[in-house]
Amino acid sequence: MKPLLLAAGLVLVALLLYAVVGHGLVNYDTLYALDWGRDLGHGRLPDYAVSVAPTPHPLATLIGLLLTPLSSRSRHGITGDGAAQAAVALAFLSLAVLGWVVFRLGQAWFNTPAGVLAAVIVLTRQPVLDFGARAYVDIPYVALVLGALLVETRRPRAGAPVLGLLAMAGLLRPEAWLFSGAYVVWLAWSPSHRADRGRLLGLVALAASAPLLWLAADLAVTGNPLHSLTGTRSTARVLGRVTGLQHVPATAPRRLGEILREPVLFGAAVGAILSLAWLHRRAWLGAVTGVLSLIAFSILATAGLSILGRYLLLPAAILAIFCGAGAFGWMLVPRGNRRRRRWRLAGAAVAVALVAFIPAQVHRISALRTTLAQQARIQTDLASLVRRGSIGAACQPIAVPNHRPVPLLALWLDVAPRDVISAQERTPTRGSYVTPANRQVADAYILDRRDPVKVVAGVPDGFAPAGGDASWRVFRSCGV
């Protein structure tokens, strides 16, 4: 009965989170996972060499493969919309699971009030809701790593169950490989594991499974086992992203602040300092995980990969748990101990700061809701043009101003992403050209403030108006 109640509770939380933000959209990377999964489902190798392709995450592509029946189904002139809706549903469920795991960890490490506060903090952070509503793989990745921590907290040196969860996480984000390696080294210090070499070798194999599977997937598709590394570095250069270890000291704290905001950082500092000083047996696992996650982040930056805020969601979740400890950890100190009173005063200061910033947090979530509604409306207008046939097989190829709409139109039109032309890569000479109706639509939907080029490509010569709506204009040149 408990699993059923838990499942029902998670679904309820997912629905509540959806109601809070109002909409769900599938981001660029996950749309490619759906396209590539459909390719595999139809017996074709995915095309990882398409311009500005995202990093192929094996587990995300596998889910895309499992969703092939939905991504291949056409309804009212749109193909694959069912797969996109399923991805959004899974994304909100992942958010709910993340909140539950954060609660359980806070409860296990400290107490129930700390766990509740930590979960509330995580599920009310605007960036967390944003990444969740857009179906980024980073949310389930963090949930899996924290799930492994929860298993280890309840069953110290659990071994295979922890490594199994980390292996799944390692097929979404390579940072999990470091956690698996560190965990195996820690297990090897145990006399029981050293005595049973066969078991230890099995655990080493499990820890190595994620990187080996990732390398094998890249090799099978591209012939280059390091494609994800080299391709991601190349894309980071093309998009002008910040990379390099030298940028980590300035960027990481700022990005953590953008995720959590000042009161939570203050509470996390209080909780980390006091719990490590006075409740170190409870706090050490979280502290070690937080440090390892920052080391992993630094390694990625050193390897030339982009320094993105969503790569810091794991340490942000750990800090949220320490913020819960900052507010309520004093309850674990024996009565009559002077430390209890000092911590309680510090906890009261944390609580006051959190409450004082509630209006600002509500405003941020409201702004996110408005942004998602605007982008959903623009995307609905684009879908309407596909349904009406204004964009489709009648006049191909389809071209767009930049790479942003490519994977979505490829999904909807049931074509390869390479068959949708980005005008930033090459100027189309025939077919259909789809462009935003105005600058507001361009800024809201296809332009990114981080991109080096923030200009919408003009309509190619020889293309004439052929339709449109409030958000988009279609131009055609269908001659041979």
What are these regions (language model features)?
Residues 28, 55, 87-94, 117-147, ...:
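Multi-pass, polyprenyl lipid-linked donor-dependent membrane glycosyltransferases
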Residues 8-13, 118, 122, 208, ...:
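Transmembrane alpha-helix segments characteristic
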Residues 6-9, 164, 204-212, 267-271, ...:
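Signature aromatic-anchored transmembrane alpha helix within multi-pass, membrane-resident enzymes
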Residues 346-407, 412:
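Membrane-embedded, lumen/periplasm-facing catalytic core of multi-pass transferases
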Residues 18-28, 43-70, 74-77, 396-399:
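Membrane-proximal lumenal/periplasmic loop motifs of glycosylation machinery
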Residues 197-271, 295, 352-367:
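Membrane-lumen/periplasm interface segments of specific transmembrane helices
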Residues 187-188, 257-287, 292-295:
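Hydrophobic, aromatic-rich transmembrane alpha-helices
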Residues 86-109:
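Transmembrane-helix motifs of polytopic, lipid-linked glycan transferases
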